[in-house]
Design a protein with these regions (language model features):
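Short, exposed beta-strand/loop patches in secreted or surface proteins that constitute
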Residues: 43-50, 72, 88, 139-140, ...
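Concave beta-strand-loop units of leucine-rich repeat
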Residues: 121-127, 144-158, 171-187, 193-218, ...
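Extracellular beta-strand-rich solenoid/capping regions of secreted or surface-exposed proteins
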Residues: 70, 153-165
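Short, low-complexity, Pro/Ser/Thr/Gly-rich segments in the mature regions of secreted, periplasmic
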Residues: 681-697
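Extended Gly/Ser/Thr-rich low-complexity repeat segments
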Residues: 64-76, 164, 285, 331, ...
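C-terminal motif of bacterial Sec signal peptides marking the signal peptidase cleavage site
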Residues: 15-18
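Sec-dependent signal peptide recognition
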Residues: 2-9
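Beta-rich interaction/scaffold domains
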Residues: 20-135, 140-144, 169-172, 187
């Protein structure tokens, strides 16, 4: 029993000792955390952000934490090394070690971030004093526009903005007003990003022409536009700029140097305009790959070469006023133009013997990769451009215009190109005044293309297409022209010199009008397969060759479309006759239309025929009109059953009107549509009603 009591007493002592030992171990004995850090200097306190094992204090870049004091809160039972109380330089990165009561270490890295000073909203600096005052704030980021100067007539001049060197970013636009009279933009050199730069406008060029150099040496990003309209600007230089999300426009009559060595992409237009003057001879954009909208370089009188060695795609090209001494255009990788491509030289228009275009550009070989032009490709006014072999790789084109290429003699081969204009525009081929050009090679089917060839100086441009939407061909040459054409889905015009002729024996139909213009002594009119002319057939000129070869052996209808098109409408100024659906002039006799059955529209108008025969003609929807036919005595139209009018003037041998008896009796011809004057016999409408078809014997 005594032993048992002793044992119980022993256990009680041990238990009491254990309880005393637990009371000496803190509850946070396993914790080793820094929970809060603040740093104070010059009356300002900055709270740190603690994330994971990093303590970050952010202060303005103008604030030094050397000599600052700090408050560091951490686990109460833990120990910290080094002791924050012993530190005075809080600008320096360092490591703090927190050791828990139980001996577990936790390291924290202390960092200082020097942040930019931001200014919200727009900043306007209209005077030198405002420049100095703003610079003193240390602001480095403006979250709006920066406006320097004023356009007011009495504004105080600002000559120096170098105090603004602390600026690094302008989220809005930098706008330079007229009262800034400095020669450079020194003071903006440290800016790396801007919303845009604006000096003058397209409507009002900047008046401060003392500004000669536009340069921001550290600028690498522009989220909007660079617009410089200032005729004093000579030098433009952005050494680090890689991308412009908007436009890049430089308009100056003094431009001497333009350097953009790192520029790759332009999200808007790229426009360099010399105001008809300029000093620069070469423009090189060594790294530009894309220009989303228009690429335009114009009115630089001294320009001799343009080079875009890496350009692949652009919205359009507008080089529409290149100097007459411009020598070289290099775009070897350019493949896609999503719009028009205008390559046009200035053209000096003097008298007949002194007109001239460009005299230096001989080829466009360094554009041979071009595959797509969705708009019009226009190449004009190049006297010495001898070849356009670069067009061979075209796969898609909207339209093609070649004009005043005086010495271009090589064939124009676009045989792989499909014509497909953007936005439902009409595709056209226009060739004019290309003196030595002899051949155009395309796909056979140009049913969606209107072709206009105006040959020049007794020249004829041969072509291979068989189907076309519209065809207009003009040449002063005097020969017989053989055309391969089979289908014209719109209007057809052909004009040639005296004594010439046309052979188009594969032509089956013309949906629009057919206008043939040969002044006189036509040798051939051969259209042996032609069955239909949907609009007017207007023969301008006089058929006066007795041995003319003619063939309209299958032509059955003329001007019978529901809404026929006309080459000539209204009335002739002589004798007031209507322009007919079939309108033709001759001084001799031809049986031109042996199977013609119907003429619609305004009917038939003939001039000067000695006889006129249409043995199969059944219908004339309008009137039968004739004038100046001194030998015409009758019409050979035995099957004619429909006629709504007669208009005869000066048919001095015509006296027998019995052919019209039926049409008068059936009231197909009414009194207002019966016009006869100057003929051998001039019956009135009532005479015809009374059966007086011939003069009384």
């Amino acid at each position: 029993m005594k032993l048992k009591q002793i044992f119980i007493a022993f256990l009680s002592v041990i238990a009491l000792y254990s309880c005393s030992e637990k009371e000496d171990i803190p509850a946070d004995a396993d914790d080793n955390f820094i929970t809060k850090v603040t740093v104070s200097v010059a009356g300002e306190t900055y709270s740190a952000v603690i994330a994971s094992d990093t303590i970050t204090v952010t202060v303005p870049y103008t604030v030094s934490l050397n000599g600052a004091s700090a408050t560091v809160e951490f686990t109460p039972s833990a120990k910290i090394m080094p002791d924050p109380a012993t530190i005075t330089d809080w600008d320096t990165e360092r490591t703090f070690r927190i050791t828990s009561f139980n001996g577990q270490a936790h390291d924290y890295t202390y960092l200082v971030i020097k942040d930019e000073i931001r200014s919200k909203g727009n900043v306007e600096l209209k005077t030198p004093a405002e420049i100095v005052s703003f610079a003193a704030t240390g602001t480095s980021i403006i979250k709006g526009d920066l406006v320097i100067g004023s356009d007011s007539d009495d504004a105080e001049k600002i000559k120096d903005i170098s105090a603004l060197g602390m600026l690094k970013e302008i989220e809005g636009n930098i706008i330079i007003r007229n009262s800034y009279t400095g020669g450079t933009l020194t003071g903006l050199d440290n800016i790396t990003k801007i919303g845009g730069l604006s000096i003058g406008s397209e409507e009002n060029s900047a008046a401060n022409e003392t500004l000669e150099m536009v340069s921001m040496t550290k600028l690498n990003e522009v989220t909007g536009n660079i617009h410089v309209y200032n005729n004093g600007v000579k030098f433009v230089q952005f050494d680090l700029l890689k991308a412009i999300e908007g436009d890049f426009v430089i308009s100056s009559s003094s431009i001497t140097t333009l350097q953009m060595p790192e520029l790759i992409n332009v999200g808007g237009v790229l426009n360099i305009f010399g105001m008809g003057k300029g000093v620069i001879s070469t423009l090189v954009f060594p790294k530009v790959q894309t220009v989303k909208n228009s690429l335009s370089i114009n009115e630089i009188s001294t320009l001799k070469s343009i080079s875009f060695p890496e350009l692949i795609e652009t919205g359009s090209i507008n080089f529409s006023s290149l100097p007459i001494e411009f020598e070289k255009l290099s775009m070897p990788k350019l493949s896609v133009i999503n719009g028009d491509c205008l390559i046009i030289s200035n053209y000096i228009q003097g008298d007949l013997f002194s007109t001239t275009g460009n005299v230096s550009l001989t080829n466009l070989d360094e554009m041979s990769n071009l595959a797509t032009v969705t708009g019009i490709l226009s190449i004009c006014n190049f006297n010495e451009l001898s070849s356009l072999s670069n067009l061979k790789n075209l796969k898609r084109i909207g339209s093609l215009k070649l004009e005043k290429l005086i010495n271009c003699s090589s064939p124009i081969d676009i045989s792989d190109a499909v014509f497909s204009a953007k936005d439902s525009e009409e595709s056209i081929i226009r060739i004019s005044e290309c003196k030595k050009l002899q051949k155009l090679i395309t796909k056979d089917d140009l049913s969606n293309v209107s072709v206009d060839i105006d040959a020049w100086a007794n020249n004829y441009v041969d072509f291979n297409f068989k189907k076309v939407k519209k065809l207009s061909y003009t040449t002063p040459d005097k020969k017989v022209f053989t055309l391969p054409i089979e289908e014209v889905h719109g209007d057809f015009y052909f004009g040639a010199g005296m004594k010439s002729g046309i052979i188009a024996n594969n032509l089956k139909f013309v949906d629009g009008y057919m206008h043939l213009k040969i002044s006189m002594m036509v040798s051939n009119l051969e259209f042996s397969k032609l069955e239909k002319i949907g609009g007017q057939f207007f023969m301008e000129g006089t058929l006066n060759t007795p041995k003319m070869v003619h063939n309209f052996s299958n032509l059955k209808s003329i001007c019978c479309n529901s809404n026929p098109s006309y080459a000539k409408e209204g009335k002739w100024s002589t004798n007031n006759l209507p322009y007919g659906g079939l309108d033709i002039r001759s001084t001799t006799t031809y049986e031109l239309f042996p199977v013609l059955e119907k003429v619609g529209g305004t009917g038939i108008t003939i001039h000067g025929f000695s006889a006129f025969s249409c043995p199969e003609l059944v219908t004339i929807a309008g009137s039968l009109s004739a004038d100046a036919a001194s030998k015409l005595t009758s019409f050979d139209m035995p099957k004619l059953k429909s006629l709504s009018g007669v208009n005869f003037v000066k048919l001095t041998s015509f006296s027998d009107f019995s052919i019209f008896e039926t049409f008068i009796r059936d009231n197909q011809i009414t009194e207002p549509n019966w016009i006869v004057s100057g003929c051998k016999y001039n019956p009135t409408y009532q005479d015809m009603k009374d059966g007086k078809y011939k003069p009384a014997e």
